[in-house]
């Protein structure tokens, strides 16, 4: 039987262990530093309320990923999910994504309309008659200059104009990433078509599946199912790595494996020889309120786009459907005390690639931390694990 080491027991690590279990013929060891599996997706409790470390609803455009997880953790669809953003200078909550009906109520409605029109006109003028002829009326109306952007700030301004960018994005993004300038963000993994103003229904997810586990303990059963055949070692640190030889030291014992699947930051595997990879963390403050619900119907969480220290308030009963006369909300405050989000900066991604290039055949690095990509969610970690399985099969 071949041997596999999975470094990290978060969702990515558990998903990887499960794919090896389904494949068969693998003796799998999962090593996790925390005293439990699941990382921030693990259900915790405060005042009797179940919650996770930040909202962890399941989002995916892939039906087969949804059906896979739904098989082991039955899911409830949350297509009614709406976002709000608080804009303090306006003393108003607005829908997010930005909605056309809200723009009409904004103090700068005329200015915003002129900016959007100018962007659209400029974008149309850049196209040839042949290109224009291929576009629908809706596509023409949504044309912008985002494809010309060189950084995050330009991307938004070229999409929606300076006024909306200032209301919804500028301070929020700098706060979220703890940066002084959004121009430092130059990872263009978002759509080159830019951001468009939403019309029609206000539900946030009309092109993706949005869901959450039905069970009171959330995703926890998946972590047990996925690792039931594995040798799971929690509260355990890997003391030393020799990745070129697929060898590690655990509790003073040297162990070599046929494959290694890494789900932690890749710099840790090589003693940060190319420099440390930066992350942004979160401080999470749980608060129980003496009301049954705090947020409006269908609103699961609220963004705060201004000078507030916190970025988001989440009401977990909207996800969990927990029954109680009280409700639990959390405040998320960006922090450097933990490492949750890889920075979307190309120079840091290039640094991460240096570590990936040092990994030999038989060593895989997956998940948000393992791939050093911010825009990796639960569905992506499952997909990464399936891709590793497919490579091993071939």
Predicted features and spans:
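N-terminal Rossmann-like FAD-binding beta1-loop-alpha1 element of flavoenzymes
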Residues: 2-30, 389
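Conserved Rossmann-like nucleotide-cofactor binding loop
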Residues: 12, 36, 267
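Glycine-rich FAD pyrophosphate-binding loop
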Residues: 21-45
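Mid-domain catalytic core of redox enzymes
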Residues: 23, 239-244, 250-358
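Dinucleotide-binding Rossmann-like beta1-alpha1 core, especially the glycine-rich loop
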Residues: 47-134, 138-143
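Structural/interface elements that position substrates and couple domains in central-metabolism enzymes
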Residues: 67-71, 155, 164, 297-298, ...
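Active-site/ligand-binding neighborhood in enzyme catalytic cores
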Residues: 92, 108, 113, 117, ...
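C-terminal catalytic lobe of FAD-dependent flavoproteins
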Residues: 342-394
